[in-house]
Curated annotation (Swiss-Prot):
This is Type VI secretion system spike protein VgrG2. Gene3D superfamilies: 2.30.110.50, 4.10.220.110, Baseplate protein-like domains (3.55.50.10), Gp5 N-terminal domain (2.40.50.230). Pfam families: Gp5_trimer_C, Phage_base_V, Phage_GPD. Residues 289-309 have a biased composition (Polar residues). Part of the type VI secretion system specialized secretion system, which delivers several virulence factors in both prokaryotic and eukaryotic cells during infection. Plays an essential role in bacterial mobility and biofilm formation. Disruption phenotype: Deletion positively influences motility while it has a negative effect on biofilm formation. Residues 284-309 are annotated as: Disordered. Belongs to the VgrG protein family. The gene is vgrG2. InterPro entries: Gp5/Vgr_OB, Gp5_Vgr_C, T6SS_RhsGE_Vgr_subset, T6SS_Vgr_RhsGE, T6SS_VgrG/RHS, Vgr_OB-fold_dom_sf.
């Protein structure tokens, strides 16, 4: 307990008795969006204090005046050192920081999906045992579809994420504990003391005061314009602009333009533009000063009064402050007998201003960039072989993601680069579950992965053994939900050049006009079942050599008009049983030299010398009857199956589509064409 008179500093460390240490001096640095840093010079009658009783233990510094508590600061001991020892006292040095500081000791890479920023921050805090935190948020913060902590400490990630969302944080202190408060508007600040401006003729007994106050204005960017791109709305600009206030003392032409703005929807774009402007102008109107009020701290405002410049007699908020205290009488052996003194130096902005951290400053580090492409594996739900969405995007498992379960929750939907991509034309090859892919990152941003390549590895081997088949260029697929494959292969070995096609089931070819084949050597066709061909016009066949056909069953030929046959030499027909010719009108058989009909030993021979009939008996109009044939019993051919006809893209409707070009709704490639025609975008 402190004395009832004067200024005094006391400290309590862990479970050690309260009188273990006396405070010789301290320095406390506090700022918005930074863990505070308390440095203590202590003295103790014990020369051998157990370090285990101090390090990583709670520590509380109290500032008293006339027995009344003025300020409390509590945190955890991050650094402890023993200094010089005398006859009665040993000096020690302590470093005290908030529990939030522990996040700086752990670097990680992990993925957060479909969570609001405050939910992400809560997870990080709770994982480090921090339960005393609060969110005093005025604005709505959208869920982040995909947010990566990438090779950065938890503290850097917290600072960066808070700054990106326009949040700032500060600490509040209670008995034995401290709370971190995240806010996004100056309305969350608490009202602090009223401090008069002391021209030098008033003492502390008359109340805490400000003994120095400097006012400053600086030229800063006047407005911000951010722009981004979304493949879901490719023709929409996603551009947002915000103009600063209080520009009367500077030009309004200092625009800060940036792309990408790190957003994909308008509400986030508008908010991010305002956050960027506030951060760039966070010291455009500012003040600094010195006071003796230990109650001042970030997250508070104070009212300045009695300043000769009346415009400065207003409410200010603390952005940063450095407290210094000296208690000389704690060092008895060194003749310490001076008074206990305290003072601080502070930086402020107007209380109505919402201060936001500038990205790239100590309060908000830049987002880590991915140095180059990475390897990942395509993943999806159990039992699936191919898993994608309507845009052909896939889910990935990165080797560094220790939290992913190699399923459809491992990442966001990730776009896949194709060899050619137009409006309903181009190439499409969906990486399948288990495939290894090369992932690039737009602008090096870990939040924006895109698959740009595919690679084999030790278990996913190439289709053919290498390097034995190094001359082969192969496109081989794998049957989905079954066994088999389709393949297109090119062999480039000299003397063995080949194009090979394998289809696991069907081959369908649709040619809208002509098809020409020129085979300079042999063609071999082997069909295990039927061949069905339909020609809607004419069929022309020229064989310059020999033609041989063998039909092991029946052969049906139906000609709706005439059949013309012309042979240069002989027509030789042999039937095992019967040859039957039937004509509806007449049959004419004409020979230049001889015509013979022969059955057994009987025959009729007609030649230029006459007609010769020979037989066992010759009957002329004396009974008997003609023989009959089997008659025509041929089969009509079946018709070929239909080939799938893929419809071309629908025609454009300019009146409707031009009207939507500049909307935030998704548009198609046809709209993109119109945008180029209209000069829009």
């Amino acid at each position: 307990m402190a004395d009832s008179t004067g200024l005094q500093f006391t400290v309590k460390v862990g479970a050690l008795p309260e009188n273990t240490f006396v405070v010789a001096e301290f320095a406390l640095d506090e700022a918005l969006n930074r863990p505070f840093n308390l440095r203590l010079e202590l003295a103790s009658a014990q020369p051998d204090i157990d370090f285990g009783a101090v390090l990583d233990q709670p520590c509380e510094l109290l500032v008293w005046y006339n027995g009344e508590l003025q300020r409390r600061v509590c945190g955890v001991v991050s650094d402890f050192a023993q200094g010089d020892s005398g006859f009665r006292r040993t000096r020690y040095q302590l470093m005290v920081q908030p529990a939030l500081w522990r996040l700086s000791l752990r670097q990680n890479s992990r993925i957060f999906q479909a969570q609001k920023p405050d939910e992400i921050l809560s997870i990080l805090l709770q994982e480090h045992g921090i339960t005393d935190y609060a969110f005093a948020l005025k604005n709505e913060h959208a869920k982040r579809e995909y947010c990566v902590q990438y090779r950065e400490t938890g503290l850097d990630f917290v600072n960066r994420l808070a700054a990106e969302e326009g949040m700032f944080y500060f600490h509040e202190f209670e008995v034995g504990k401290h709370r971190i408060v995240f806010a996004d508007d100056s309305a969350a600040l608490t009202a602090g003391p009223e401090l008069f401006f002391n021209l030098g003729n008033r003492s502390l007994e008359q109340g805490p005061y400000v003994r120095q106050f400097h006012y400053r204005e600086a030229v800063r960017p006047s407005d911000v314009e951010l722009k981004d791109y979304s493949f879901k709305t490719p023709a929409y600009g996603l551009s947002h602009k915000k103009v600063g206030a209080e520009l009367t003392h500077q030009r309004d032409t200092y625009q800060h333009f940036d792309f990408p703005g790190r957003y994909k929807e308008d509400p986030s774009g508008k908010a991010f533009a305002q956050h960027r402007l506030d951060a760039l102008r966070n010291d455009a109107v500012a003040g600094s000063g010195k006071s003796n009020s230990s109650a001042l701290q970030p997250g508070q405002t104070f009212s300045l009064t009695e300043h000769p410049n009346d415009s400065l007699n207003t409410d200010w908020q603390i952005v940063r402050i450095q407290h210094t205290g000296l208690q000389s009488q704690a060092l008895e052996e060194e003749g310490g007998s001076g008074p206990t003194v305290y003072h601080n130096e502070f930086g402020v902005v107007k209380a109505s201003t919402t201060w936001r951290a500038r990205i790239g400053s100590p309060e908000a580090p830049h987002k880590p960039m991915v140095d180059g492409p990475q390897i990942a594996v395509v993943v999806g739900p159990e039992g699936e072989e191919i898993y994608c969405d309507e845009h052909g995007r896939v889910k990935l498992q990165f080797p560094w993601d220790r939290y992913g379960s190699s399923n459809d929750q491992s990442s966001c939907w990730v776009r896949v680069s194709q060899g050619w991509a137009g409006g309903q034309y181009g190439m499409m090859a969906i990486p399948r579950i288990g495939h290894e892919v090369i992932v690039s990152f737009l602008e090096g941003d870990p939040d924006q992965p895109i698959v740009t390549g595919r690679t084999y590895h030790a278990t996913n081997r190439p289709p053919y053994e290498l390097p034995a088949n190094k001359t082969r260029t192969v496109l081989r697929t794998e049957t989905h939900q079954g066994e088999g494959f389709n393949e297109l292969r090119f062999e480039d070995q000299a003397g063995k050049e080949e194009i090979y096609i394998h289809g696991q089931k069907d081959l369908n070819v649709l040619i809208e006009n002509d098809a020409a084949w020129h085979i300079k050597h042999d063609q071999h066709t082997d069909i295990d079942n039927e061949r069905v061909t339909r020609i809607k016009a004419n069929d022309h066949l020229t064989v310059e050599g020999e033609k041989r056909d063998q039909i092991k069953a029946d052969y049906s030929l139906t000609v709706d008009a005439s059949l013309h046959q012309k042979l240069g030499q002989s027509l030789l027909v042999e039937a095992g049983s019967e040859v039957h010719h039937k004509a509806g009108m007449k049959i004419v058989m004409e020979a230049g030299a001889e015509l013979t009909l022969k059955v057994g030993g009987s025959f009729v021979k007609i030649d230029p010398s006459g007609v010769t009939l020979s037989g066992g008996s010759i009957k002329m109009n004396s009974g008997g009857s003609p023989g009959s044939g089997s008659g025509w019993a041929g089969q009509m051919p079946i018709q070929p199956g239909a080939v799938e006809v893929v419809a071309p893209p629908p025609p454009m409707d300019p009146a409707r589509q031009i009207a939507t070009l500049k909307s935030a709704e998704p548009v198609c490639e046809i709209c993109e064409q119109l945008a180029r025609q209209e000069g829009g975008g």
